[in-house]
């Protein structure tokens, strides 16, 4: 912008008047810019005050709850490793049962989750909980040595509520695991299950390293995806392909909730 100054023969007073006019013109010209600069702070993204993803701590807890088959030990261990490599994990807690040991019980899961808030910021950090087992419409089978029990949706919801951790991702690989969604899923809790509440999931052979869903989601899709939802979409298609090829009724994997969690998680390259 250019401001023209007219020269006249008005002398000193004329010069003063002319200088005043120039000053007024300058103030008028830059007033909009000054006003916008003053309101800029009010337009800042509210998220600027939140910790960046790099500063958020991710805790991974993974339990293989059925001791009668080695596939659940293998899947609990492998799933935790993949999640930690993609999103970070500090700490990573893995427990599983075998035909003789009883490391992954309902009580030990409760104790592990109770200890989580001591090692993270419950308001900003993120908890991944991975559970793999056989399932029923009532919940997850917990078989430790000769002892058997059922982890119900209500019991698990109570454990998670007691942690006070806001941002959670719960991934359950089991038949009928969709039964957990109504009690667990919310804007702050993303829930991913291997099946809906009415169907079985497949692939739990004793010598296998993964179930169908575990292989598709953790071992395949999550290794190459930027987000959990993208990984889920890929895994769901893979699982359906394998089920139809083998003549199984589709398990219908589910994803629900997590609107406040997903933006905080982008996989590492």
What do these predicted regions represent?
Residues 133-163:
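A short, glycine/acidic-enriched catalytic loop
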Residues 59-62, 92-96, 127-131, 168-172, ...:
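Structural recognition of the beta-strand scaffold that forms the well-ordered cores
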Residues 66-70, 98-102, 133-138, 147, ...:
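Solvent-exposed loop/turn segments at secondary-structure junctions
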Residues 4-23:
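Bacterial N-terminal signal peptides that target proteins for export
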Residues 74-78, 82, 104, 108-115, ...:
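Extracytoplasmic/secreted proteins, especially bacterial periplasmic and envelope-associated proteins
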Residues 20-32:
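Bacterial N-terminal signal peptides
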Residues 174-262:
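Active-site-proximal C-terminal subdomain of hydrolase catalytic domains
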Residues 2-4, 11, 30, 35-124, ...:
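Boundary/activation segment at the start of structured domains
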């Amino acid at each position: 912008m250019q401001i023209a100054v007219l020269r006249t023969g008005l002398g000193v007073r004329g010069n003063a008047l002319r200088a005043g006019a120039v000053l007024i013109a300058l103030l008028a010209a830059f007033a909009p810019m000054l006003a916008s600069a003053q309101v800029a702070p009010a337009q800042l993204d509210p998220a600027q005050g939140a910790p960046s993803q790099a500063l958020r701590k991710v805790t991974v807890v993974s339990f293989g709850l059925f001791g009668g088959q080695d596939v659940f030990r293998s899947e609990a261990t492998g799933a935790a490793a993949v999640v930690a490599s993609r999103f970070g994990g500090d700490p990573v807690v893995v427990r599983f049962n075998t035909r003789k040991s009883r490391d992954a019980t309902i009580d030990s899961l409760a104790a592990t989750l109770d200890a989580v808030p001591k090692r993270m910021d419950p308001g900003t950090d993120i908890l991944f909980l991975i559970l793999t087992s056989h399932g029923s419409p009532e919940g997850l089978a917990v078989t430790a040595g000769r002892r058997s029990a059922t982890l119900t949706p209500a019991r698990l919801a109570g454990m998670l509520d007691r942690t006070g951790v806001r941002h959670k991702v719960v991934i359950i690989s089991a038949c009928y695991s969709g039964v957990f969604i109504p009690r667990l899923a919310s804007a702050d809790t993303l829930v991913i299950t291997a099946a809906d509440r009415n169907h079985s999931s497949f692939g739990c052979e004793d010598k296998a390293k993964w179930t169908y869903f575990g292989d598709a989601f953790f071992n395949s899709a999550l290794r190459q995806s930027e987000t959990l939802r993208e990984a889920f979409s890929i895994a769901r298609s893979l699982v359906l392909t394998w089920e139809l090829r083998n003549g199984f009724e589709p398990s219908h994997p589910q994803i629900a909730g997590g609107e406040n969690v997903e933006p905080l998680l982008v996989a590492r390259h």
